[in-house]
Amino acid sequence: MAYGFYAPIGEYETESVTLPGGASVRVESPDNIGYGFWTHQAQGAVAWYPWEDKRMAVTTVLTHEIHSDKEDFDLTPGRNLTLNWGISQYLPLKKDNSLLLEVGPAGYDSWQVSDDEGSDATSDAHDQVHAVGGQLGVTHVPWNLVVNLHYFYEFAAKDRFQGQAFGISIAKKF
């Protein structure tokens, strides 16, 4: 089990826009790089190794996100549940197994599991998105260091953006 949070950092501004007919509404600025709210998350992970030598791993990570009130709006975004999954095949790059190549499919499924709340909540729709892709990485066993590259293609998005994602993960065990 793990706990994490996202702080509302990065530029986040709102602006007033006048609609045809004279009504004025507050909207998010189009050049924001922040979300304008805190997120707390609880996370649990499971790994299964089909062989004793652990040359393959089947992993899942379940994350539950709880969001705070959105800055400058009467809106609390609904909670999200995300399932990340992957299969990693480890291939030795050195005969002594000190350097391993990791390759395999990966993906995620994310669902909004509660309603947005507040007078600025404009839709009863719950967002969701699904993604499939792959991962490629290197593990340096003596240093307990892992570097992974990920690519995901999103599909079946509802009430949110859909696209492609690239990422890098660096992990070091101390």
Model-derived regions: residue spans:
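Outer-membrane pore/translocation modules
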Residues: M1-G78, S123-D127, L145
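Outer membrane beta-barrel transmembrane domains
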Residues: D72-F174
